[in-house]
Amino acid sequence: MNEITCISPINGEIFAKRNTLSLKVAQEKVQLLRAAQKAWSARPLAERISLVMEGVDAVGKMNDQIVPELAQMMGRPIRYGGEFGGFKERAQYMSEIAEEALQDIEISNDSSFKRYIRRIPHGLVFVVAPWNY
């Protein structure tokens, strides 16, 4: 099994090591995640928003733990660790506009047929997001 190692640029020491998954285990996890995503998308929007905001609040409560860890991993001064204010602000805004933004968009009001755009979940999406600093 391979490892992923995070080396702190502050002192060149290993900050963390994590084992990678085998292809088979990763594929099994993807199948579980696809099933979970279907169950998630079946929940009412208000419930999903509530659960996401609970997660945002949980991350906010961990701010004092997370900021020093990020600083150590990235080699960035702790004083620049204010991302979580913006994270919560963006999440709050998205939750406020979600219901209206996700409604069907009527293309025409022709009585002979209905044309509209419906936003539906894409399903499972894998992202390796960079941490910009």
Indicate where each model-derived feature is located.
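N-terminal Rossmann-like NAD(P)+-binding subdomain of aldehyde/semialdehyde dehydrogenases
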Residues: 1-114
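Conserved small-residue-rich beta-alpha loop and adjacent elements
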Residues: 106-133
